[in-house]
């Protein structure tokens, strides 16, 4: 994903940006490498066609799952089933959400259906140990980070009004957690939303959790910009360890 993101020239879609951000979150680089990539998205165009395709119709279940929001992921997956019928992709997503939620019976039901198809049997065999508890989810590349965000964040309720990215960013920029990886997600979302109060609140929380570590590169840049360019009053940067460069 990151290799493809680095190759893109010109504007990108919000979907491409969100999937790239998920890859950076999994690598722990959301606050240190995000702005080295292209974040200039394609401007919205007037929709005159009767068929409208949004992020929520294409990849919202995958995006919500990777942020640990299994309820919204299941909802969007089921909506796709209602519109377009069941697919192997949707059944896989429902299986992964059931595993993350600890819903063993549901997970087994989906796996049983998928096992009847020739090309899905290998994937079913890979998932079965996680359902049976033989393999811990924390050791899975697929489940490790979604599980952490599932446990550290609060569950989304209500509706996203079809705005997937804004819903997730707003939720996480207000989330206070003591887990270093989850807190970096919250800090990154505060920067994306350019919310000054949330940003400095998350900066303080990052410092409390990581007193012996330097702030990520983009966070240092944002702090310096706020103090010296935007002239935000009442900010003391004496506690910050800045990179020499």
Model-derived features: positions:
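Soluble catalytic regions of membrane-associated enzymes that act on cell-envelope
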Residues: 1-149, 153, 157, 174-175, ...
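Short, surface-exposed linear patches
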Residues: 46, 212-213
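Active/binding-pocket-proximal capping segment
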Residues: 113, 204-209
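Outer-membrane pore/translocation modules
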Residues: 155-171
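Non-catalytic terminal/accessory regions
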Residues: 184, 197, 210, 216-224
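Surface-exposed patches in mature extracellular/periplasmic domains of secreted proteins
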Residues: 199-202
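Polybasic, proline/glycine-rich intrinsically disordered low-complexity segments
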Residues: 216-245
